[in-house]
């Protein structure tokens, strides 16, 4: 096996690993509000988007073309560069998952690839007009638009159901949430699975397996990416589901349906035009909007503000990881460089997973009362976030025997004759 084929295999495996992390990192985008409102049981709520993400991945390839051709010069791409970019995306995904921060997998991937490109060939390798028009501007506009649509939708829902018994409306909206959450999952598949397809497409172009003029990835790329994302989604990113469902605002079924419908509309629109949108930012914006639109709702703006900071540093920090990885792999070179880079990635992933086991979050405590700040899950240490079981009552005090008089301080008592 020659070195280039070896590198191609490593890139494909790493790309599918990124797609897997993207699946469990972004499960919360579709199902956090349904779980928080009680519309779906947690286990069912992660199985449904797994199937719909699989289907959605086959519905569009416009975003894949953007990743493959619209952000960096395909003629300057090497397999080392693509691998380093993927490492940047995976490491950032895992770190933010550990902290429970719903950051953008899309921007982590793009940041990693752009950083590796700059390290490899300099600024000239990046198509900056594409980065601005296809990534940065849509991210800002989509998050604000989702917040606005979510707020207006929630306000309209509560306005039109005013006077109807709350128990009756919540029962109806819980059923409606199954449909709206399914639509978000389908939309997520049409957008996020495409990004990994685009990366593998880019690697195949670099290797010479497909023409640089091709506009659609090979079928095996589409199928493998769809399956990897579906598998990751089924695992459920419980840490991020908890933050989205409980950390920003307490979600009721009407809010949940409005937020999910807003997310689906914005994501599907962006996928149609080929924008590499962050579905996480759209979902977060919709949840915030549902809190703003509900009269009397409490929005945790401190948590939201820290999320925005995480979004702002995603591109540059993932880019730094990508640039460092490229420098390391390229400096060592050959088979040793590729093997070392691959081994370091898996060692890092294992260390993060082991750290997460100190404060496990799963379907049993994902809906526990929110306490602390944005990284409450990590700070909980070895203790669970909350115990949902009712407290065990204390045993009753013993009943004194008949004719018993409790002794009093300073008074001597004598036994009866």
Swiss-Prot record:
User: Region annotation Disordered: residue ranges?
Assistant: 379-417
Something else the entry says is: Was identified as a high-confidence drug target.
Name of the protein in question? Probable low-affinity inorganic phosphate transporter
**Membrane topology category:** Multi-pass membrane protein
Q: State the similarity comment.
A: Belongs to the inorganic phosphate transporter (PiT) (TC 2.A.20) family. Pit subfamily.
Sorted keywords for this record are:
Cell membrane, Membrane, Phosphate transport, Symport, Transmembrane, Transmembrane helix, Transport
Q: Name one GO biological process term.
A: phosphate ion transmembrane transport
Q: Which InterPro entries match?
A: Phos_transporter
Tell me which stretches of the chain form a coiled coil: none
* Compositionally skewed regions (Pro residues) per UniProt: 390-404
Q: Which spans are transmembrane here?
A: 5-25, 44-64, 81-101, 108-128, 135-155, 218-238, 327-347
Cite a single GO MF annotation.
phosphate transmembrane transporter activity
Q: Which reaction equations make up its catalytic activity?
A: phosphate(in) + H(+)(in) = phosphate(out) + H(+)(out)
Superkingdom of source = Bacteria
What Pfam families is this protein classified in? PHO4 (PF01384)
Q: What does this protein do?
A: Low-affinity inorganic phosphate transporter.
**What organism does this protein naturally occur in?**
Mycobacterium tuberculosis (strain ATCC 25618 / H37Rv)
Point out the gene that encodes the protein: pit
Q: Does the keyword Signal apply?
A: no
Q: What are the annotated GO cellular component locations?
A: plasma membrane
